[in-house]
């Protein structure tokens, strides 16, 4: 499928499940303090920031060439939703964000909706999951934190 830019294209894009993807939920261990530190971006381009708890959890669950893929797809109660999966294939339109040996990969269409945001791993009684925090491209989000509406 050719990469198509624009809000409508991303909203209507069909996202196929990644082969070998795993559910990224339950975890054990104490809740880590979330000290936000930044990955080094290329000048003039969008970036994703990885928190220390995100890096720590990725180092625990990834093997070999695996990385965390972040996608934005249409859906959820606010119009768009975040999708996390483990993957091993980097596509030509992907951007790789690395910190401390942990990698998060975002395709160029999704990056337009999350640039400047922080990827965190949160461990709570009701769930443990990767989350997007402080997304400057989001106008508002739902209470569960997995869907959002964009600023127009």
UniProtKB/Swiss-Prot annotation:
It comes from Bos taurus (Bovine). InterPro entries: FeS_biogenesis, FeS_cluster_insertion, FeS_cluster_insertion_CS, HesB-like_dom_sf. Fe cation binds at residues 77, 142, 144. Belongs to the HesB/IscA family. The lineage of its organism: Eukaryota, Metazoa, Chordata, Craniata, Vertebrata. It is found in: Mitochondrion. GO terms for molecular function: 2 iron, 2 sulfur cluster binding; 4 iron, 4 sulfur cluster binding; iron ion binding. One of its GO terms (biological process) is iron-sulfur cluster assembly. Involved in the maturation of mitochondrial 4Fe-4S proteins functioning late in the iron-sulfur cluster assembly pathway. May be involved in the binding of an intermediate of Fe/S cluster assembly. This is Iron-sulfur cluster assembly 2 homolog, mitochondrial. NCBIfam families: iron-sulfur cluster assembly accessory protein. Residues 1-6 form a transit peptide. Pfam families: Fe-S_biosyn.
